[in-house]
Swiss-Prot record:
Coiled coil ranges: none
Superkingdom of source: Bacteria
Any one of the GO CC terms: cytoplasm
Entry similarity comment: Belongs to the class-II aminoacyl-tRNA synthetase family. Type-1 seryl-tRNA synthetase subfamily.
Compartmental location: Cytoplasm
This protein's pathway: Aminoacyl-tRNA biosynthesis; selenocysteinyl-tRNA(Sec) biosynthesis; L-seryl-tRNA(Sec) from L-serine and tRNA(Sec): step 1/1
Main enzyme class: ligase
EC identifiers of the protein: 6.1.1.11
Name of protein: Serine--tRNA ligase
UniProt organism field: Dictyoglomus turgidum (strain DSM 6724 / Z-1310)
Amino acids binding ATP: 262-264, 278, 349-352
Entry-linked InterPro entries: aa-tRNA-synt_IIb, aa-tRNA-synth_II, aa-tRNA-synth_II/BPL/LPL, Ser-tRNA-ligase_type_1, Ser-tRNA-synth_1_N, SerRS_1_N_sf, SerRS_core, tRNA-bd_arm
Length: 425
């Protein structure tokens, strides 16, 4: 949640922030929020005065008898009714104020490139050589079916469209990828978690999981306040809710494994087929909690770890600095890694990492105490160590052979014990 003091002192900063994010200024009416805040403070002052009067009268009642006492009792009763009425108005104003503050996006980093949408994202780096095939490369779904690695047909029969079974060597690849991530990040001091796949809606809302458009929303559990998590960022982010951490313990570096569930409503088309957009997948998530002055460095650090993993897999990729108009609400700045996917003939997103500064920490009330005694909000960052479904696409398509077989990346062979997947059909 945004600090109301900043809005009071300079509301134009948020107005500009909303425009730069390509959001509707009318939906995020900053002037109205300022009015609500002023009204709340005015009501609070009035309530304080009335309560002071009532307390004074209550003290006087015991000092008087007869008519004077009855008169004071009546005055106290009238004040009580006024206070109750005013308190209700105050509660309504405060509720609307916090609701509107809750919807405001985070302040952009000055370093985030300005732009309207994904077309304005800035490529800042490329790594690896794109392989030239002497045959027409297949896409991952054709390869997966040829090698009996997925079953969408039975997944649809059992659960619904865009659900699937991973099979045979694809299962080994999932666990191998997780082991590669663990062996890469454990020496860096990360603590390992397997998180719940469900979270309370207050935690999901606190993280600010508000994807742009209808294509990635939360599954709700009927008759509960629970939702299936779309990322372990949600459960790792909520881990320290309402806590005050010690400065000397920061940064906290967490690696969380979970299933991820997304409704992906409206996500159709050639490039969304197969494993690219599915309702359920497994993911390892990097999550760091740090001091405000360290978050930019930690952001680059997470990106470096993500790059290290894909370099070990020897998959060509590029890094994008996401523009202001393509950022989600919590992120002040975000980097995406897009791997080369020969089957579609273009790069496709495989990881992202976001610096959410104090946005999530304010919403979840996570603070730290400096050695000097001051208490401040922490900064929180997240990144994809590996998203299995996207990683499998990149592996299948980059390591395919003319006969449809798939080579196993050298970095994964020790975990699997084989060097090649052969067609079974």
């Amino acid at each position: 949640m945004i600090d109301i003091k900043i809005l009071r002192e300079n509301p134009e900063i948020m107005k500009e922030n909303i425009i730069l994010r390509n959001l509707d200024p009318q939906k995020y009416d900053v002037d109205y929020i300022i009015e609500l805040d002023a009204k709340r403070r005015s009501l609070q002052k009035e309530l304080d005065n009335l309560r002071a009067q009532r307390n004074k009268i209550s003290q006087e009642i015991g000092k008087h008898q007869g008519e004077e006492r009855e008169k004071l009792i009546k005055e106290a009763k009238i004040l009580k009714e006024k206070i109750e009425e005013l308190a209700k108005e105050y509660d309504n104003v405060e509720k609307e104020l916090f609701s509107r503050l809750w919807q405001l996006p985070n302040f952009l980093s000055p370093k985030a490139p300005r732009g309207k949408d994904e077309k304005d994202n800035v490529e800042i780096k490329k790594w690896g050589e794109i392989k030239t095939f002497n045959f027409t490369p297949k896409d991952h779904l054709d390869l997966a079916l040829l090698n009996d690695l997925v079953d969408f047909e039975r997944g649809s029969k059992v659960t619904g469209s865009n659900f699937y079974y991973l099979k045979n060597e694809a299962v080994l690849l999932e666990f191998a990828l997780f082991r590669l991530v663990i062996d890469t990040l454990l020496p860096e001091g990360f603590k390992l978690f397997i998180t719940p796949d469900l979270a309370r809606m207050e935690i999901i809302d606190g993280i600010g999981f508000q994807p742009r458009g209808p294509e990635a929303q939360i599954y709700r559990v009927e008759d509960t306040d629970l939702g299936l998590i779309a990322t372990a960022e949600i459960t790792l982010g909520g881990y320290h809710k309402d806590e005050i951490l010690d400065e000397l313990d920061l940064p906290l570096k967490y690696l969380g494994f979970s299933h991820c569930f997304r409704t992906e409503a409206g996500a159709y088309g050639r490039y969304n087929r197969g494993l690219y957009r599915v309702h359920q997948f497994s993911k390892a998530e990097i999550f760091i909690i740090c001091r405000p002055e360290d978050s930019e460095e930690m952001h680059e650090y997470i990106l470096g770890l993500e790059e290290k993993i894909f370099q070990k897999l020897e998959i060509p990729y590029r890094v994008l600095d996401i523009c202001s108009g393509d950022l989600g609400a919590p992120a002040a700045r975000k980097f995406d890694i897009e791997a080369w996917m020969p089957g579609r003939g273009e790069f496709g997103e495989v990881t992202s990492c976001s610096n959410c500064t104090d946005y999530q920490a304010r919403r979840l009330n996570i603070r730290f105490r400096r050695v000097t005694g001051e208490v401040e909000y922490v900064h929180m960052l997240n990144g994809t160590a590996i998203a299995i479904s996207r990683a499998l696409i990149a592996i299948f398509e980059n390591y395919q052979q003319e006969d449809g077989s798939i080579l196993i990346p050298k970095a994964l062979q020790p975990y699997i014990g084989i060097s090649e997947i052969r067609p079974k059909k």
